[in-house]
């Protein structure tokens, strides 16, 4: 033992030179040391299938990913398919019923039967889509001869009343400049724009003023000028007017409006108590600088004419 130990530790130069040969010829301890690298090689061989397994796992992933796009269109294809049947049964049918010229023609036929004879007034009533000026929930009633609420305790006048007032204001004339008091939703201003060169309209309720602008915008009416202000004051900067149409009832006609009426001009307004029980459609004609002639015509019902703005 001691001799062998002395031989190995430290090794002589010639032993070092012979060391490789001893590792091949002696299977003792050095063979065990040589087995370690072989064991290290074995995990490498074991790792290769492990490396293949992720590849085998990845291989189906593209197949699954490819299957998802194939199934994804199915729900998207079903979603549009559901509204498509509903759309033709509701929207187009309703839009056609409301916008068809035939519906407005029937309204015009009723106006003619009720005594409106001016062809220009009838054409103007037929040209303006009244359903665009009322709430969507009331659109189906737009061409009935009834007043409809537009909010803020205001209403859109009956088609028969609108046609009657405009016909009285025109009296067969061609109107150059017209003033409307009470824009409301903008419907009467739109009708007036077809029979007058320039239409000025005043609204004292700011939300209605804004709503009228929105309602008139799609129609692209170039000759209407909307103003937010007190209608009882009128619009002196644009006076005189060939005609003034007041869409609210006061106990009398404001003097400021009478002064803004051109000589030979005509003013049409409901006059009477705010309760509406004794309101009468009144025609005022200016016959001279300081002279007006008044005619009391039809029983009507309008919202009250108020001063100021809100």
Swiss-Prot record:
Keywords: Cytoplasm, Methyltransferase, S-adenosyl-L-methionine, Transferase
One Gene Ontology biological process: protein repair
Reaction catalyzed: [protein]-L-isoaspartate + S-adenosyl-L-methionine = [protein]-L-isoaspartate alpha-methyl ester + S-adenosyl-L-homocysteine
InterPro entries: PCMT (IPR000682), SAM-dependent_MTases_sf (IPR029063)
Localization of this protein: Cytoplasm
PROSITE patterns (UniProt xref): PCMT
Active site: 157
Pfam short name (any one): PCMT
This enzyme's EC code(s): 2.1.1.77
One cellular component term from this protein's GO annotations in UniProt: cytoplasm
Compositional bias of kind Basic and acidic residues: 14-29
Top enzyme class: transferase
Region (Disordered): 1-41
One GO MF term: protein-L-isoaspartate (D-aspartate) O-methyltransferase activity
Domain of life, source organism: Bacteria
Job of this protein: Catalyzes the methyl esterification of L-isoaspartyl residues in peptides and proteins that result from spontaneous decomposition of normal L-aspartyl and L-asparaginyl residues. It plays a role in the repair and/or degradation of damaged proteins.
Family designation: Belongs to the methyltransferase superfamily. L-isoaspartyl/D-aspartyl protein methyltransferase family.
Protein name: Protein-L-isoaspartate O-methyltransferase
Organism: Burkholderia cenocepacia (strain HI2424)
